Amino acid sequence: MITETMSKTVITSEHLAKAMTYTQYRELIDTLLAENKTTGTNHSEAMVEYTRMNAQRMRRVEKTTVLDDELVDLMLSVQNKMIWVILTEAWCGDAAQTVPALVKIADASPLIDVKLMLRDEHPEVMDAYLTNGGRSIPKLIVLDAETMEELGTWGPRPAPAQQLFLDMKADRKSVV
């Protein structure tokens, strides 16, 4: 569920000019993996392996996600141009599962433009959209394309999954 906010955003036209399309994001991931790197500053073997697994996950989600008719109709009913900004990183497992689906949903409307921004390259943006004080991703910020007014946010994961994550974290169980 998207949390409605109706306020000005910290995201500027300069941020959007530097943001990526989903295709550019996927190409960046492939390029970095060819160099045994990932997004962000931690290029450890573990982070690169997470990124490699996530590239496979994204391909699977891209191929298997089918939007139901009700959702397509809802997206076609959008009346105003929007920009969906998604804060993400290639090594993030939650992002690998949800970003391709969010892009497919947005693509169902000709009035929605998707822009991806790397969390670690835009701390000033990420810090405006913390989840319980943390830099949790993916984070979707929905903007009115004409006014740049923030219409709502979503993320980092669906509410039931977020509650499970919080419960496991509270019980000190592994959440990685």
Language-model region placement:
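Generic beta-strand structural signal
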Residues: 82, 110, 136-140
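Short helix-loop-beta junction
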Residues: 104-112
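Conserved small/polar residues in nucleotide/adenosyl-binding loops
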Residues: 175-176
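Local sequence-structure signature of Cys/Sec-based thiol-disulfide redox active-site neighborhoods
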Residues: 75-104
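Thioredoxin-like thiol-disulfide oxidoreductase module
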Residues: 115-150, 161-172
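N-terminal leader/targeting and pre-domain segments
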Residues: 2-79
